[in-house]
Amino acid sequence: MGQKVHPFGFRLGYNKNWQSRWFSKKEYASFVFEDHNIRKYVKKTLYHAGLSKIEIERAGGKVRLILSTARPGIVIGRKGVEIEKLRADLRRKFSREFSIEVNEIRRPETDAQLVAENIAMQLERRVAFRRAMKRTVSMSRKFGAEGIKVACAGRLAGAEIARSEWYRDGRVPLQTLRADIDYGYAEAHTTYGIIGVKVWIFKGEILDNEVEQ
């Protein structure tokens, strides 16, 4: 049975970058664990803000967070109130100085993580899984995705036996290194149990000279 390699890990250092960027010897394990807890806390705090990616950089005891979100206004707040509150909460919880940068996602319909979370939200609202998948796929294609694949796994439609179903439109070349593949995963907590949602979005090929730049 063939298994899928993670699209980010497969392309790290080629056309994808690490989401935690720092070097350490003695504190490596504690930093990895702290990064996990920071992401968990920020995701929980900003769950309604369409947060796709949390990048972490460390230098001289300071932590820099780069948040990619579809709704930057909610993250920043009026006159920067919300972002200052988040910075203060993080400083109090983790005893470190934080700086936060917010990047807007112009097209959330072609961001795999946001698409996966959108499908999971629909499943929790009891929308039929096939309808949710097809509607999302057609929307992503309309907004410029060259290809998209969506997979749902679990007790679909309340079935006794768990299974997985997937739907694809366009090209999704997972083994082509120069392909710009975005990947996202989300979980739908339904009355029948958890349904896992995976999304792969192909945004086009990145040529060698673009990678070098």
UniProtKB/Swiss-Prot annotation:
SUPFAM superfamilies: Prokaryotic type KH domain (KH-domain type II) (SSF54814), Ribosomal protein S3 C-terminal domain (SSF54821). Keywords: Ribonucleoprotein, Ribosomal protein, RNA-binding, rRNA-binding. Coiled coil: none annotated. It comes from the Bacteria. GO terms for cellular component: cytosolic small ribosomal subunit. The keyword Translocase does not apply. The keyword rRNA-binding applies. InterPro entries: KH_dom, KH_dom-like_a/b, KH_dom_type_2, KH_sf_prok-type, Ribosomal_S3_C_sf, Ribosomal_uS3_bac-typ, Ribosomal_uS3_C, Ribosomal_uS3_CS. GO terms for biological process: translation. One of its GO terms (molecular function) is rRNA binding. Residues 38-106 form the KH type-2 domain. Part of the 30S ribosomal subunit. Forms a tight complex with proteins S10 and S14. Binds the lower part of the 30S subunit head. Binds mRNA in the 70S ribosome, positioning it for translation. Belongs to the universal ribosomal protein uS3 family. This is Small ribosomal subunit protein uS3. The lineage of its organism: Bacteria, Pseudomonadati, Thermodesulfobacteriota, Desulfovibrionia, Desulfovibrionales. The gene is rpsC.
